[in-house]
Amino acid sequence: MAKQSNLTTPTSLPDFMYNVGDRIDLLKRVLKVLDNPDKQFKIIHICGTNGKGSTATMIVAILRQLNYRVGTFTSPFIGTLYNGIQRNFSDISKAQFDSEMAKIQHVMVRPGFNHDMLSEFEAQFVVAMLFFADHPVDYVVLECGLGGELDATNAVSNTMYSVFTEIGLDHLGILGNTVAEIATTKSKIIRQGNTTITAPHQRPEAFQILKSQAAAKQATFLSAD
């Protein structure tokens, strides 16, 4: 879980580092030094146990039909490292990935940072944010990697929609041991005043937790029923 890397190439990147120190604060600091690329577009943040990838694909297809420029960050990657980062359904190229990685390397050697601080997923996430800022998009469809509250993707600032697919039992002992505990962790992607949408037929305990968190954040709460 805590394998580390010098961030030199995509294949040398480490695994997830979940709940190892304050990951969100670290990522926010990295993004700030990089001029907050995540603030350059509107974010649709997708979280859940099942159906995240298909939901992301449908949302991107709808937005493209409306002529919006759309970035997508999905996990796990299917096929190559690069097809988890797409702009208008086209993968980031190796040259583009390497160019954004070089910017991260320059940050991680600054005082207060260290080259082995980031995990694979965290570095890929920052690459995606930089890529979408450098190749402008209107929306980014952002898929959580693990959980919600402590997931790297929860470091973003400009979340317009928080979308929840079906929440069930996953990553037991890491995210929680019950649907309610897991839903609580995932609900933390809801942002103040945004729009929160839950999948139809959400489990009752998960539904109530999402609804309560949305109310606490003064977010509009919608069910796709």
Residue spans of the language-model regions?
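Aromatic/hydrophobic pocket-lining residues that form π-stacking "cages" and hydrophobic walls in ligand
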Residues: 59, 128, 210
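Short, surface-exposed alpha-helical segments at coil->helix boundaries
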Residues: 24, 98, 207-211
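ATP-dependent carboxylate-amine ligase catalytic core
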Residues: 31-32, 36-39, 65-157, 173-175, ...
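N-terminal-biased segments
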Residues: 2-22, 88-89, 139-147, 162-174
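Short functional linear segments
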Residues: 1-48, 55-57, 61-68, 73, ...
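Acidic, Mg2+-coordinating active-site environments of NTP-dependent enzymes
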Residues: 111-112, 136-143, 159-225
